[in-house]
Amino acid sequence: MVQSSGRALKVFSGLSNLTLTQEICDFLKIPMGKSEVIEFKNENLLVKIGENVRECDVFVIQTSTSPVNTRIMELLIMIDALKHASAARVTAVLPYF
């Protein structure tokens, strides 16, 4: 288990670029965090965190692909879900390419 500041490190991905997140997790030799993002027909989003993140350092990787507004809301809702799940720190990683 990779640790950061003595805490477990977890990496989650939004829907924008799962391949990039998987490559980062493979490099770090850790599994990608389990989460589910549901987009409803009325464009509302629901994010479910599928594992324990209590007292972990969590990184969320989300690129700004189209539709940008939806991807940013997805990121913010995921951060909120992680904080409500008692993650110690949540860091957003937004690569731009």
Question: What do these predicted ranges mean?
Answer:
Residues M1-F97:
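PRPP-associated nucleotide enzymes
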